[in-house]
């Protein structure tokens, strides 16, 4: 068979490459949760070497994939708009279309994977940005100081060095009012003394007060205007603050003045003559037992109760009422009545924090920890419980035998010192004797181990039989 060229899966000449980018903030679908937040952006096939060579002409020598030429274009150059499709062929001047190498005729993708055709003027993040620009609700002086437009050279905006002394210094009007007030007080005191001594009529006192007031009254003002109506006695308090509005540190502009007038009008409805019926107030809270207020209330209650209580000092019969004859006769007889007096139980007049934890019927105590009993383990060889039977020491015969072995005076070959000038025959004989001694020791050790094992097993069986009250029988 002739060799056929295999058709490639992707034709590079007709393929179109895309970049997966985030959707623009000005895209209307950026706030849509159902729309994908990443879109496909077609790549522009421009050779990197040509672009870098073009960048070197303008002094850009960065060796990366970023296009720096887009920042070097003339912003005021001539431009011409040519309508074209996003993936269409470029338009040539002779009226023919030059097909691109990357044809999109075979691409069928949904419109949701591409950016929207129409975009908004303001992005989504800029809509949530704080307000910028001039703020009309700010004080003009504050805005001028923030913008460095404050006129520091204006003499009205400057403070004197002794502005504190000038502010505390009383004015001429205040000094005159203080002098008039002091003179009026002195005159009134002397007039009271004269009235007490002479005991004159009200008309005389009125004439003297009038003559004294006329002397210190200001020209052009009546007498009562100065004596009974001073500036500091003017009613300048509001209904809802009890303070003078003019004494506030804030400058009262039109809006604040309107705000104060509305509150004044609102509280005017609740004056004493128009207050009407009010709901009962629900008072909640607590008071200390040893408070002075509570003691005063209790004392007032006891005093009122003592005044209303009527006590009889002597018991006397009514004069107009006659006692019956039966009662007079029965009064002579004495009757014995047995009265059982019970001791009054002592009542608690106080309570401590300990008494809240218990009472006379409940006596709490600590719960003692009882350890869990140990499990009985059985021997895998004999089936006898371990660590239950008492352990016995060596018998008298075994102790005697052990002492005999330990106290033996027979020298052992292994413990004899080796001579420095030992011959070969002596060395062989010594080694042979050591081997025989070790052999005998192993045999003896094995026999002792077996004897001890049998004796231990016999004793455990005897103790077990004694515990179960079973006598051992020999067959």
UniProtKB/Swiss-Prot annotation:
Coiled coil regions in record: 419-475
Positions of modified residues (Phosphoserine): 17, 24, 248, 331, 408
Composition bias, Acidic residues: 184-197
Keyword Cytoplasm found: no
Compositional bias per record (Basic and acidic residues), positions renumbered to this chain: 198-211, 419-447
Family, as annotated: Belongs to the LTV1 family.
Name this polypeptide is given: Protein LTV1 homolog
Organism: Bos taurus
Lineage, broadest ranks: Eukaryota, Metazoa, Chordata, Craniata, Vertebrata
């Amino acid at each position: 068979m002739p060799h056929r060229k295999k058709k490639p899966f992707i034709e590079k000449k007709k393929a179109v490459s895309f970049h997966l980018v985030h959707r623009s903030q000005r895209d209307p679908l950026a706030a849509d949760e159902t729309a994908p937040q990443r879109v496909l952006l077609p790549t522009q096939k421009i050779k990197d070497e040509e672009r870098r060579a073009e960048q070197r002409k303008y002094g850009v020598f960065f060796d990366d994939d970023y296009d720096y030429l887009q920042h070097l274009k003339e912003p005021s150059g001539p431009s011409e708009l040519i309508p074209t499709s996003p993936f269409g062929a470029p338009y040539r001047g002779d009226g023919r279309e030059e097909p691109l190498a990357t044809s999109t005729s075979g691409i069928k993708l949904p419109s949701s994977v591409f950016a929207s055709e129409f975009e908004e003027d303001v992005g989504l993040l800029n809509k949530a940005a704080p307000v910028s620009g001039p703020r009309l609700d700010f004080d003009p002086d504050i805005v001028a100081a923030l913008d460095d437009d404050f006129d520091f050279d204006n003499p009205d905006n400057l403070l004197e060095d002794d502005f504190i002394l000038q502010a505390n210094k009383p004015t001429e009007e205040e000094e005159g009012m203080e002098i008039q007030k002091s003179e009026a007080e002195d005159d009134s005191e002397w007039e009271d003394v004269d009235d007490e001594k002479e005991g004159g009529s009200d008309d005389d006192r009125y004439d003297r007060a009038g003559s004294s007031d006329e002397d210190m009254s200001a020209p052009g003002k009546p007498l009562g205007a100065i004596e009974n109506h001073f500036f500091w006695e003017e009613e300048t308090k509001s209904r809802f603050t009890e303070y003078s509005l003019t004494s506030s540190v804030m400058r009262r502009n039109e809006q604040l003045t309107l705000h104060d007038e509305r509150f004044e009008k609102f509280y005017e409805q609740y004056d004493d003559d128009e207050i009407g019926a009010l709901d009962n107030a629900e008072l909640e809270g607590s008071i200390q037992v040893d408070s002075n207020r509570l003691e005063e209330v209790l004392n007032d209650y006891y005093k009122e109760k003592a005044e209303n209580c009527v006590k009889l000092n002597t018991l006397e019969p009514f004069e107009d009422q006659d006692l019956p004859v039966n009662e007079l006769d029965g009064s002579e007889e004495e009757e014995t009545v047995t009265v059982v007096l019970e001791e009054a139980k002592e009542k608690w007049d106080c309570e401590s924090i300990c008494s809240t934890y218990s009472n006379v019927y409940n006596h709490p105590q600590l719960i003692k920890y009882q350890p869990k009993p140990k499990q009985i383990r059985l021997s895998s060889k004999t089936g006898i419980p371990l660590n239950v039977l008492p352990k016995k020491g060596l018998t008298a015969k075994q102790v005697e035998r052990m002492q005999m072995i330990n106290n033996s005076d027979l020298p052992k070959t292994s413990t004899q010192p080796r001579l420095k000038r030992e011959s070969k025959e002596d060395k062989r004989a010594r080694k042979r004797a050591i081997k025989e001694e070790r052999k005998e020791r192993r045999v003896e050790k094995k026999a002792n181990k077996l004897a001890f094992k049998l004796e231990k097993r016999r004793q455990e069986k005897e103790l077990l039989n004694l515990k179960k009250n079973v006598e051992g029988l020999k067959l």
